[in-house]
């Protein structure tokens, strides 16, 4: 008998090497974490890790899988580099080839491998808990797919499945596999039938089901953590050329932001508002040092008071404090920082601030990643090392960087998901410092569910959360939240009551819903009376905003008019935002837009008109008015357009109107000063919490998690509504767009290998999507429904019929037969 295993796992490596590398990577990942003993003891986690590592690919020891992989070697690795050529030639003889080819043709399931390992591992699990055994079974069984609902169908083998597993077991090279596991003190069962009856029959499921629902989220989180740990290691062996970057996190200089501020702005505040910014910054730093052991922190400040830099500094301070605590406990854990924003449109803006900070203090490339659907991957990690494409993907999508800037969607769909790709990064939530900027953008129906899970992440993984908002952090209720501007809330209120930049005028709103014609008349009157003022008009619907823009453009030929909405190409939106920031001095600036300007777009105008929306959106709109307090008194004028508020949750609109009515009663007039905003926001937060106290959606989601219904959790937790009746349309209107489209077509037509094509498209995607806009179905003729391309192209001759470069889709609609157009 040979003294080493000849089994093969991939076309370029033996199974023994693959398992050894998965062991090495998963050990590094786990050892970098501090996990609370209430979750699992270090000994338990280490043992479960090794069981998963050494049995997840046991099914590759079957003759069926070995034949499949050797067949692939002849196609992909004909020189047989890195593997035993004699073994391959022996295995691939004519008789074996014919017999195995026929068996696989009759039943392709014989070539699968995950399920067999899921059952064989049961002979090495020490615990009697049937629920734990089911979790470990599920993790191995689904490590090449997505987690399934824990159910009778998932855990009870039907006769056909049992027959396949027994046939696979009969054709495993167990003597060879024992060479791999003998040094680890694991064993293989003597026979398979008993295992399948014990852990794949009705009695097993009855015992598992008696453990459901669980008391809390622990089993749900245990499944996600172990699944993520195995995925990170399994994929890491295939995607990483070197292992040095695994588990490595950088401890940022606690004085980094202070040093940046000194170089960027100087030491003396230049404007009155700068004094408030500096006071808030210092108070937050002081208070986070006093409260290092709190799960939830809040930075509640008015818009324009430097929340971003203050939050970055708070995270760096907390990272240093926690790293010191872990070191005192004998560990080497350094928390990652994950900065989450509600919209992709502001990720680059905030990441650029971080890059400036890192650059000013001499931090090289490789410490920061942007992770969202429009982002490219960084080319380096620490120490300026060059990364391959697969390494870039691994580190970025796995949140392996010391600082990741991402979206709420990426964060929350890592927790409320069953998807393999999303869950790979779950383990890096452990010990992380997570900043949620503009946290109020999480839909109210998810508040309680998110609160429960965030608390569980702290309880088991010591994860910390910093909520940044200009409104009260009503996401968390009834739990300890340290307000970093002032734990007593006295100074927090003072930051708001001391503001006098703007006033909220409710007079127009109190007139009731107005037609667009009536509103345009009001807008025009105001503009003519204030020719020295800039105007921002925010409407809720694209169609309405387009109509208002066109009419105001006609009425104000000498003004500088700009239009923004989701109907405008991203490349053009960026250009227009820069124009708005730097307007001509000799023209009145008028900007008409939808709520896209609420997404952290840093613009500043004198008078803002806002269509009725939930109060947090009104707050965001107010943040676009007289931000630095240098223009006298800015005005935010609320109005209500006919059918305009229909895009929002009716409950939120009702609460907003009730809160504003009470504000009018308190003030005795229809103009609310900025100093009253804190009280209004407090009132709104209390109303929101009261309304969602009996949230059925929360109860249902928690019930699914306690019953380990992973598919149901994934299918029902959606931050972004899927617009199934929308088209992705590429507007090919210029030389730059045409070059990008040609590159896209070339990839589709010429790159045959699906992995190479996927990688080439990913690299092109950020540039491609700058010229893509989502069209409502009715904005294009029905003939386009037959276009099978995921992206429809409108070229220079076609797009003018359906798309206007100024205002986007909608003005050239052609109603279908028996249909009217309404966008």
Q: Where do the model's predicted regions map?
A:
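Walker A/P-loop
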Residues: 292-315
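Conserved Walker A/P-loop ATP-binding site and its immediately adjacent core
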Residues: 333-358, 372-375, 542
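Conserved helicase motor
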Residues: 369-381, 540-543, 561-577, 592-598
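Interdomain hinge/linker at the junction between the two RecA-like core domains of SF2 helicases
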Residues: 470-526
């Amino acid at each position: 008998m040979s003294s080493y295993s000849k089994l093969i796992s991939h076309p370029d490596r033996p199974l023994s090497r693959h398992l050894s590398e998965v062991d090495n990577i998963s050990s590094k990942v786990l050892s970098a974490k501090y996990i609370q003993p209430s979750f699992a003891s270090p000994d338990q986690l280490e043992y479960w890790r090794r069981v998963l590592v050494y049995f997840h690919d046991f099914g590759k020891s079957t003759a069926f899988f070995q034949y499949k992989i050797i067949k692939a070697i002849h196609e992909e690795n004909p020189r047989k580099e890195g593997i035993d050529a004699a073994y391959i030639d022996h295995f691939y003889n004519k008789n074996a080839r014919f017999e195995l080819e026929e068996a696989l043709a009759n039943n392709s399931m014989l070539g699968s491998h995950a399920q067999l390992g899921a059952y064989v591992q049961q002979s090495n699990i020490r615990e009697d808990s049937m629920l734990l055994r089911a979790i470990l079974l599920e993790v191995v069984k689904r490590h090449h797919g997505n987690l399934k609902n824990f159910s009778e169908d998932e855990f009870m083998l039907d006769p056909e499945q049992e027959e396949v597993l027994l046939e696979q077991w009969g054709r495993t090279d167990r003597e060879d596999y024992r060479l791999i596991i003998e040094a680890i003190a694991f064993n293989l069962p003597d026979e398979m039938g008993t295992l399948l009856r014990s852990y794949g029959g009705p009695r097993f499921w009855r015992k598992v089901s008696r453990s459901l629902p669980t008391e809390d989220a622990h089993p749900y989180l245990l499944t996600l953590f172990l699944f993520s740990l195995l995925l990170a290691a399994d994929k890491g062996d295939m995607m990483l050329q070197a292992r040095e970057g695994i588990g490595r996190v950088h401890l940022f200089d606690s004085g980094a932001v202070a040093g940046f501020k000194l170089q960027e702005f100087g030491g003396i505040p230049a404007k009155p508002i700068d004094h408030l910014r500096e006071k808030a910054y210092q108070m937050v730093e002081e208070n986070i040092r006093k409260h290092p052991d709190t799960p939830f922190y809040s930075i509640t400040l008015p818009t324009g008071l430097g929340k971003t830099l203050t939050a970055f500094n708070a995270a760096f301070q907390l990272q240093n404090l926690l790293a010191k605590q872990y070191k005192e406990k004998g560990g080497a854990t350094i928390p990652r920082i994950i900065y989450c924003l509600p919209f992709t449109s502001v990720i680059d803006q905030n990441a650029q601030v971080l890059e400036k900070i890192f650059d000013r203090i001499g931090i090289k490339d490789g410490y920061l990643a942007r992770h969202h659907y429009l982002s490219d991957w960084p080319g380096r990690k620490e120490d300026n090392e060059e990364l391959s494409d697969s390494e870039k993907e691994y580190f970025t999508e796995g949140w392996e960087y010391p600082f990741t800037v991402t979206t709420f969607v990426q964060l929350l769909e890592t927790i409320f998901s069953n998807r393999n790709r999303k869950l790979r990064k779950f383990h890096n939530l452990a010990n992380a410092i997570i900043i949620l900027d503009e946290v109020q953008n999480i839909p109210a129906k998810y508040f309680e569910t998110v609160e429960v899970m965030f608390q569980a992440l702290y309880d088991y993984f010591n994860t910390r959360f910093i909520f940044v908002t200009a409104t009260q952090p009503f996401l968390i209720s009834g739990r300890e939240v340290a307000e970093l501007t002032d734990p007593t809330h006295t100074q927090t209120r003072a930051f708001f009551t001391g503001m006098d930049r703007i006033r909220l005028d409710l007079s127009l709103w109190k007139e009731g819903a107005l037609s667009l014609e009536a509103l345009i008349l009001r807008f025009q009157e105001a503009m003519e009376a204030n020719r020295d003022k800039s105007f921002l008009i925010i409407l809720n619907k694209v169609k309405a905003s387009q109509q208002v823009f066109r009419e105001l453009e006609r009425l104000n030929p000498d003004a500088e008019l700009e239009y923004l909405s989701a109907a405008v190409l991203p490349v053009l939106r960026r250009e227009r935002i820069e124009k708005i920031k730097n307007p001509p001095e000799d023209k009145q600036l008028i900007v008409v837009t939808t709520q896209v300007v609420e997404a952290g777009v840093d613009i500043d105008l004198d008078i803002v008109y806002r269509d009725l929306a939930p109060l947090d959106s009104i707050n965001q709109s107010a943040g676009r008015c007289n931000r630095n307090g240098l223009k006298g008194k800015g005005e935010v004028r609320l109005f209500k357009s006919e059918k305009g508020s229909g895009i929002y949750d009716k409950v939120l609109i009702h609460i907003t109107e009730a809160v504003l009515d009470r504000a009018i009663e308190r003030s005795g007039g229809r103009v609310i000063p900025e100093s009253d905003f804190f009280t209004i926001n407090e009132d709104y937060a209390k109303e929101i919490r009261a309304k969602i106290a009996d949230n059925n959606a929360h109860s249902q989601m928690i019930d699914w998690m306690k019953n380990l219904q992973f598919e149901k959790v994934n299918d029902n937790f959606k931050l972004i509504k899927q617009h199934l009746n929308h088209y992705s349309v590429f507007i090919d209107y210029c030389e730059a767009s045409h070059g990008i489209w040609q590159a896209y077509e070339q990839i589709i037509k010429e790159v045959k290998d699906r992995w190479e094509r996927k990688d080439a498209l990913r690299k092109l995607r950020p540039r491609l999507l700058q010229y893509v806009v989502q069209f409502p179905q009715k904005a294009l003729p029905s003939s386009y429904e037959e276009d099978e391309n995921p992206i429809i192209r409108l070229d220079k001759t076609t797009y003018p019929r359906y798309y206007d470069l100024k205002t986007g889709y909608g003005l050239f609609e052609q109603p279908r037969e028996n249909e009217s157009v309404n966008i």
